[in-house]
Amino acid sequence: VPVDAYYYEAVKWAAEKGITGGVGNGLFAPNQPCTRGQIVTFLWRAAGSPEAKAMSAFSDVADSAYYAKAVAWAVENGITGGTGNGKFSPDATCTRAQAVTFLYRAAGSPKVSGSAEFGDVATNAYYADAVAWAAKNGITGGIGGGLFGSNNDCTRAQIVTFLYRSVK
């Protein structure tokens, strides 16, 4: 991770806090898309890795998976309900809209006044309040050109930066 990268401080913080250990061999892989399993694990670790009351019932989350406790915690705390049909889809790439929504729900879904000022965020989108909250709290400024990039893959650098900014 280059020291002049926008995500340097966030990755350093996340590594020091045990939120991420990277992808192996001393690498973080900042531009690699983040999966749903990785994102809930980052959130869970940032929350102190609390024990869930029960493991999740998702058919695609084995109790032995590294993200199993994180998924159970995320469900218990209303952060995610899965992707339908009894699945969580832990290996699916997470979009920026999904990532910010997970973060917003982890923060307790605080009330937001107004809407996000991004041309690609419809006021009735499920993630509209989450994006507005993230923008108003300095968590994201979008991808430029007045856009949030709702359907773009969320990279590992982006989610760790969002998480870092949300707690600072």
Where are these regions (language model features)?
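Feature responds to low-complexity, polar/acidic, surface-exposed segments characteristic
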Residues: 1-8, 16, 21-40, 44-70, ...
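Catalytic DNA-binding helix-loop module of base-excision-repair DNA glycosylases/AP lyases
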Residues: 101
